[in-house]
Amino acid sequence: MNKTTEYIDAMPIAASEKAALPKTDIRAVHQALDAEHRTWAREDDSPQGSVKARLEQAWPDSLADGQLIKDDEGRDQLKAMPEAKRSSMFPDPWRTNPVGRFWDRLRGRDVTPRYLARLTKEEQESEQKWRTVGTIRRYILLILTLAQTVVATWYMKTILPYQGWALINPMDMVGQDLWVSFMQLLPYMLQTGILILFAVLFCWVSAGFWTALMGFLQLLIGRDKYSISASTVGDEPLNPEHRTALIMPICNEDVNRVFAGLRATWESVKATGNAKHFDVYILSDSYNPDICVAEQKAWMELIAEVGGEGQIFYRRRRRRVKRKSGNIDDFCRRWGSQYSYMVVLDADSVMTGDCLCGLVRLMEANPNAGIIQSSPKASGMDTLYARCQQFATRVYGPLFTAGLHFWQLGESHYWGHNAIIRVKPFIEHCALAPLPGEGSFAGSILSHDFVEAALMRRAGWGVWIAYDLPGSYEELPPNLLDELKRDRRWCHGNLMNFRLFLVKGMHPVHRAVFLTGVMSYLSAPLWFMFLALSTALQVVHALTEPQYFLQPRQLFPVWPQWRPELAIALFASTMVLLFLPKLLSILLIWCKGTKEYGGFWRVTLSLLLEVLFSVLLAPVRMLFHTVFVVSAFLGWEVVWNSPQRDDDSTSWGEAFKRHGSQLLLGLVWAVGMAWLDLRFLFWLAPIVFSLILSPFVSVISSRATVGLRTKRWKLFLIPEEYSPPQVLVDTDRFLEMNRQRSLDDGFMHAVFNPSFNALATAMATARHRASKVLEIARDRHVEQALNETPEKLNRDRRLVLLSDPVTMARLHFRVWNSPERYSSWVSYYEGIKLNPLALRKPDAASQ
């Protein structure tokens, strides 16, 4: 069999159509497929003429009228995006110097926006009312938190062993031996550090406690009259003048899962009858060439199966500027002016049509809302770790989300996905300038969502959480190490954001959001320092002789004291703050029904197991987050390349590599404390033994087999597992379908396979006008690639080839026309098997 016959056999067409094609050479085949009978100056450009025919062979249902167009050079091109209508979107430079801002105000140059002027009188009154209520509520929260912290800190001071604070006079130590002075001061310096850290950490815990408590009351009693969800009935028709874009920025994601969730979401939107009000944009920043080709294939299949031509678009950026935020900004500049709203989706997001329509209705009912964040529910994972986290977020999450809404109202959080945004003010106010300066906290902003919410609020637009709007879903990391990789990015981003704490015009609530974002990770090293100082104090107490006389001519000694009853009382009250939100959560479930959680006994047992699990993981996260914070401040780059895992499980080798130092620290800490004082080891036991067990917990919790076993036992059961909503059922069904027809080694198939080459050629975006310089560059790229083995062709060079329709056509022609010359490519491709279902429907392929 010659190569021409093999080439024809690779086409997904009937035998009669194959027989009609010429068998003489590859060029003749392309000429026969070219309905326009074009002539090409170069022989290896002939595949460009057959692109349309090859696309129609493989994806006939994806090529509606107008889907295939001509570029400026007459080459066939898939119209994957609508015509751009550009808008101006540029950032204002950050001004973080409060002295400079004060000087501007003195000179009358303060340009703080007067946003209320755009509202009607009735809207202004409503706006002022909830803002006043929100301010009062937050003052109450501040008073409660600080009062609780002051009482607890004073209580902590009374139970520390060294109580000679008032007798220490530095002037009395002048002329005294330095070592004696140091030993006198050391216990009190340690205790001072302990008290300061205790106050900060207790304040942090207290704020969370009051947030959960108010969320509990909110959910138990019913709606707050200031809830944004109360502003609509829920069945109002959508305004046809206000169109919404569903945008999904992706980067090297699981293609099968991305398009399964997106299809389920779109099918749900169609079921509402409101699909005409929505468009979908898949905004790819992927830089893995194999994934890029797989995305193109999945997009073609998606628009064919849902009839999405003209409504579902795909674009891959060649210049990945500013990561996700830059991708969204790029969409806004090119197509944002065509839409009133946009809903940002993550790669794992799934939303029901009712939820999306509900968000649009809320936007239309609240003309001063800039961002409305839904409350996504976690579901869809099977590992023990993920199921435990899903259960925790499903049980405790509603309390904290409702509590956040209670305290913040329309000056709330935006989490970067599953939220609707008013496009015009976003374009005008939410472009992000890079942070000035040098170092690890300068440059492009990493955690863009909090900053965009702060800028939206600074411009006078509300940022709300629709915490009681159902139908919003996401997925969690499958194991601890994957979660920590994500935390590494979030930690750095939140630390960077704190530089904006003093930026001009930021609302106090969003300054507090920046502070809480930092504390989410800074609390870890603070907790570690608290434990270290407590241990050091115990070492001093055990190994040194107490200083009974701190002043000259002191009549009575100062005895170190130990008051275990007070220590236990303080410990118990702190535990109440930590664990009462969990108890309130389970009380709420007991009151409203436990059936969807497996019943009374199973949900209670699941709660106890989750508490144990969180106790085991807290010290592990503490140490990792401490490393993340320190590395960010020191400018260290933490390299974390985890191996690919088919079942999302952590291997023993990787676990001991990541957790080995923690295990060693736990052993040394435990042995040292046992040697010094067994009683103190009792207090440290939850921490040191968690560190010792960390590799074992990490591995076992990452196993899907263990997670599925708990699912069969109805432990960690959530409503989405007990009675899955249709959109999640569809996601699983589409995911299985996509996996059956998945495409691996996409770049090599785009070079060799006639159908995938046509797809890559038609979707290539580097469509320059002809020039001699460009032709020389193209020939150089093609020759250099073919003169090397495919294994040596790196990612960036593959992307350059994949982005140019001419280079893809020439590569395709040469490997088929001269297989002997490019034998290394041919032999490499022969070792790759194309999924037989990749080019046709599974039922058709099996016939």
Curated annotation (Swiss-Prot):
<dbReference type="InterPro" id="IPR001173">
    <property type="entry name" value="Glyco_trans_2-like"/>
</dbReference>
<feature type="topological domain" description="Periplasmic">
    <location>
        <begin position="626"/>
        <end position="679"/>
    </location>
</feature>
<feature type="transmembrane region" description="Helical">
    <location>
        <begin position="194"/>
        <end position="214"/>
    </location>
</feature>
<feature type="topological domain" description="Cytoplasmic">
    <location>
        <begin position="701"/>
        <end position="847"/>
    </location>
</feature>
<dbReference type="InterPro" id="IPR029044">
    <property type="entry name" value="Nucleotide-diphossugar_trans"/>
</dbReference>
<dbReference type="GO" id="GO:1900727">
    <property type="term" value="P:osmoregulated periplasmic glucan biosynthetic process"/>
</dbReference>
<dbReference type="Pfam" id="PF00535">
    <property type="entry name" value="Glycos_transf_2"/>
</dbReference>
<protein>
    <recommendedName>
        <fullName>Glucans biosynthesis glucosyltransferase H</fullName>
        <ecNumber>2.4.1.-</ecNumber>
    </recommendedName>
</protein>
<dbReference type="GO" id="GO:0008361">
    <property type="term" value="P:regulation of cell size"/>
</dbReference>
<keyword id="KW-0997">Cell inner membrane</keyword>
<keyword id="KW-0472">Membrane</keyword>
<feature type="transmembrane region" description="Helical">
    <location>
        <begin position="603"/>
        <end position="625"/>
    </location>
</feature>
<feature type="transmembrane region" description="Helical">
    <location>
        <begin position="680"/>
        <end position="700"/>
    </location>
</feature>
<feature type="topological domain" description="Cytoplasmic">
    <location>
        <begin position="1"/>
        <end position="139"/>
    </location>
</feature>
<feature type="transmembrane region" description="Helical">
    <location>
        <begin position="513"/>
        <end position="533"/>
    </location>
</feature>
<keyword id="KW-0328">Glycosyltransferase</keyword>
<comment type="function">
    <text>Involved in the biosynthesis of osmoregulated periplasmic glucans (OPGs).</text>
</comment>
<dbReference type="InterPro" id="IPR050321">
    <property type="entry name" value="Glycosyltr_2/OpgH_subfam"/>
</dbReference>
<feature type="topological domain" description="Periplasmic">
    <location>
        <begin position="534"/>
        <end position="569"/>
    </location>
</feature>
<comment type="similarity">
    <text>Belongs to the glycosyltransferase 2 family. OpgH subfamily.</text>
</comment>
<keyword id="KW-0808">Transferase</keyword>
<feature type="topological domain" description="Cytoplasmic">
    <location>
        <begin position="591"/>
        <end position="602"/>
    </location>
</feature>
<dbReference type="GO" id="GO:0016758">
    <property type="term" value="F:hexosyltransferase activity"/>
</dbReference>
<keyword id="KW-1133">Transmembrane helix</keyword>
<feature type="transmembrane region" description="Helical">
    <location>
        <begin position="570"/>
        <end position="590"/>
    </location>
</feature>
<keyword id="KW-0812">Transmembrane</keyword>
<feature type="topological domain" description="Periplasmic">
    <location>
        <begin position="161"/>
        <end position="193"/>
    </location>
</feature>
<feature type="transmembrane region" description="Helical">
    <location>
        <begin position="140"/>
        <end position="160"/>
    </location>
</feature>
<dbReference type="GO" id="GO:0005886">
    <property type="term" value="C:plasma membrane"/>
</dbReference>
<dbReference type="InterPro" id="IPR023725">
    <property type="entry name" value="Glucans_biosynth_gluTrFase_H"/>
</dbReference>
<keyword id="KW-1003">Cell membrane</keyword>
<comment type="pathway">
    <text>Glycan metabolism; osmoregulated periplasmic glucan (OPG) biosynthesis.</text>
</comment>
<feature type="topological domain" description="Cytoplasmic">
    <location>
        <begin position="215"/>
        <end position="512"/>
    </location>
</feature>
